[in-house]
């Protein structure tokens, strides 16, 4: 149920951006892989999200809930990332980065046009929070 609503939200986000067929073929595949309430932190949950990029793949600019802390680890390949107005950085397999509550993620993309890339984003977020990603306002 959660996975279905998360994926439906991701698809709605993609549709709302007016992506062309070519752009949608480059869109990231996003899968909720786990979700657990934190027993020692009432009202908070930890959610793991696998983000898979094909060659040249990307996610549109986005933000997350104001209560979400995200810690991302690159599992395969290389990820280009820009948080807020900082520089675009490239993270390789085994490297990690974080996003603080309210941060804007302007660039999130595969660093390669020929190889896939994957990252695991771990969210600490309000348990009642269902949507994890919102498009950046243009």
Task: Describe every region a protein language model picked out.
Residues 38, 42-43, 52-54, 85-102:
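Short acidic-glycine-tyrosine-enriched beta hairpin
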Residues 60-65, 83, 90, 108-111:
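Short histidine-centered beta-strand/loop micro-motifs
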Residues 5-16:
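Bacterial N-terminal signal peptides
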Residues 87-88, 102-129:
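Ligand-binding loop in jelly-roll beta-barrel domains
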Residues 67-86, 93-95:
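Glycine- and acidic-residue-biased ligand/ion/polar-headgroup-sensing regions
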Residues 25-61, 67, 122:
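A short glycine-rich, His/Asp/Glu-containing loop-to-beta-strand
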Residues 17-23:
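Sec/Tat signal peptide C-region and signal peptidase I cleavage site
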Residues 130-138:
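Short, low-complexity, Pro/Ser/Thr/Gly-rich segments in the mature regions of secreted, periplasmic
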